[in-house]
């Protein structure tokens, strides 16, 4: 009869997860240790971190990015993918979204152009750059190419969603990858609400994205200028 006895199990999803609350908790806990250098190292090595975690069976890990070390839930190892994730737990995906928002906050909260320039030259988005998009397209657009930014559709002006829509329309991405963005809130609005109430804002966001100088495997003007320093000139 034991095979007919059942028990409740912990949820495998982050039901009730509030990205804004999670982000604030993250900022409080990392206020003293987080800096642009560490964020730069994270974004340049996030893919490598995922690959390394996929080979480690431990449920938790403590990757170090420069001098900044952080505990993450390892949901990349095949046997760990259904493990529960708490509201304030960190994953590589959540870290990506949190750090992108942190960079945007640092950018918008400071009117000093020298600080803006420091951020632009320090933080590199490999995904945006590989599509020919640079900081000159605007901080919200540039940072929205980072995974995890879909958690903050209002902060990033729908760009995480509309970048995905454009890539699907151009055959650059499978439509299934839009699911995560289409489940998110926009501020206090649930997905079913903003899908009907924010059509104009989404259309404007998509228009901005479609007007970018897209180039598959292309280089941004910043990247071209960088290469010119080494005697490489591109059209």
From Swiss-Prot:
Per its record, what are the GO molecular function terms?
RNA binding
One matching Pfam family, short form?
Bunya_nucleocap
Tell me which Gene Ontology terms the entry assigns under biological process.
symbiont-mediated suppression of host gene expression
Output the InterPro entries linked to this UniProt entry.
Bunya_nucleocap, Bunya_nucleocap_C, Bunya_nucleocap_N
Decide whether keyword Translocase is in the record.
Answer: no
Segments crossing the lipid bilayer = none
* Keywords assigned: Capsid protein, Eukaryotic host gene expression shutoff by virus, Eukaryotic host translation shutoff by virus, Helical capsid protein, Host gene expression shutoff by virus, Host-virus interaction, Ribonucleoprotein, RNA-binding, Viral nucleoprotein, Virion
Q: Where along this sequence does the record place binding of RNA? A: 17-18, 47, 50, 75-76, 81, 94, 124, 126, 129, 167, 177, 179-180, 183-185
Organism domain of life: Viruses
Cellular component per GO, a single term? ribonucleoprotein complex
The cellular location(s) given in this protein's UniProt record come to:
Virion
For whether the record's keyword set contains Electron transport, the answer is no
Function of the molecule: Encapsidates the genome protecting it from nucleases. The encapsidated genomic RNA is termed the nucleocapsid (NC) and serves as template for transcription and replication. The NC have a helical organization. Seems to participate in the nuclear relocalization of host PABP1, thereby inhibiting host cellular translation.
Q: What is known of its domains?
A: The N-terminus and C-terminus are involved in homooligomerization and play an essential role in viral RNA synthesis.
Q: How does this chain assemble?
A: Homotetramer. Binds the viral genomic RNA. Interacts with host PABP1.
Please state which protein family the record places this protein in. Belongs to the orthobunyavirus nucleocapsid protein family.
What's the protein name?
Nucleoprotein
Q: What is the lineage of its organism?
A: Viruses, Riboviria, Orthornavirae, Negarnaviricota, Polyploviricotina
